[in-house]
């Protein structure tokens, strides 16, 4: 019960920041139709190796969603047909399933986890970039509000097949599996996977000024471009009547991983030190002698008074 209360408080902080940047909350199904995913070639186990797949009684093959770019893009075809319908920003909190080879460290890396995934649909790259920075700022607010902002760094990482770079938000902890290199004077960080002379030159960084940090990834933001809108035919008519594909972005935060990270970085020798914003309760009231009716009555009065004044 205590852990769930903290999870819910983290979720509410994330929800609040998503709503502030005009995100609309939705809920999508976890069961995935393979036909949609085949259009982007991500049903193929050679391309994506962490699917959980199953079959219905009629032998129809389904998958358990590890992300939702394909199904949401397909749905948005019914809601976006003109540039006047853009931009759109939608997000959800949902349990994801990933057949991870190395599921370990409790809620820091599991095969089943609660995730906030946000998706943006924009007219063009310029409009997308403006929102991308808004999400980045919202993420910084989230990490500050839950008490780990001072240890969390926006980090250049591989853009995969989507873009030159993506950005990860990496929190310093010995429990992490990632390595970043941080320029403490500028605050710029790069993931070990892109730690090359070419990237450092592009970011105007010097190797000798970088400090190695062990970290855990607590969030990420991706520019998707037309990676999904093109094969799934999410197309709009622009202001000149020309047809163009929608420019997309994807932004994730693992709620359970945030909770686990707080425990790792803020605990002391006596146990967990929850930041007030996510602590399961504001205070603990202990009645030391429940056999004494006067003491018990007074304790109940204090308890009722605290509740009336907004304490939990």
Predicted regions span which residues?
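NTP/phosphate- and nucleic-acid-binding module
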Residues: 1-312
């Amino acid at each position: 019960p205590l852990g769930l209360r903290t999870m819910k408080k983290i979720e509410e902080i994330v929800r609040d920041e998503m709503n502030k940047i005009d995100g609309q909350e939705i809920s999508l199904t976890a069961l995935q139709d393979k036909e949609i995913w085949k259009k982007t070639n991500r049903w193929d186990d050679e391309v994506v190796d962490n699917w959980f797949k199953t079959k219905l009684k009629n032998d129809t093959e389904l998958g358990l969603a590890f992300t939702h770019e394909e199904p949401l893009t397909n749905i948005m075809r019914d809601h976006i047909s003109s540039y006047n319908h853009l931009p759109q920003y939608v997000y959800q909190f949902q349990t994801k399933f990933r057949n991870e080879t190395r599921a370990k460290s409790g809620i820091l890396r599991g095969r089943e986890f609660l995730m906030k995934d946000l998706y943006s649909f924009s007219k063009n790259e310029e409009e997308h970039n403006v929102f991308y920075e808004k999400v980045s700022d919202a993420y910084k607010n989230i990490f500050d509000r839950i008490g780990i902002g001072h240890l969390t760094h926006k980090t250049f990482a591989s853009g995969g097949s989507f873009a030159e770079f993506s950005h990860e938000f990496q929190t310093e902890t010995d429990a992490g599996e990632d390595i970043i290199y941080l320029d403490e004077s500028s605050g710029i960080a790069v993931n070990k996977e892109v730690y090359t002379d070419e990237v450092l030159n592009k970011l105007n960084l010097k190797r000798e000024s970088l400090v190695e940090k062990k970290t855990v990834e607590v969030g990420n933001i991706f520019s998707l471009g037309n990676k999904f809108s093109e094969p799934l035919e999410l197309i709009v008519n622009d202001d000149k009547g020309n047809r163009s594909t929608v420019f997309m972005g994807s932004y994730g935060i693992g709620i359970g991983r945030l909770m686990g990270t707080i425990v790792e970085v803020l605990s002391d020798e006596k146990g967990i030190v929850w930041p007030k914003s996510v602590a399961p309760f504001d205070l603990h009231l202990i009645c030391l002698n429940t056999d004494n009716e006067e003491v018990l009555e007074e304790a109940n009065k204090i308890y009722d008074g605290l509740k009336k004044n907004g304490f939990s």
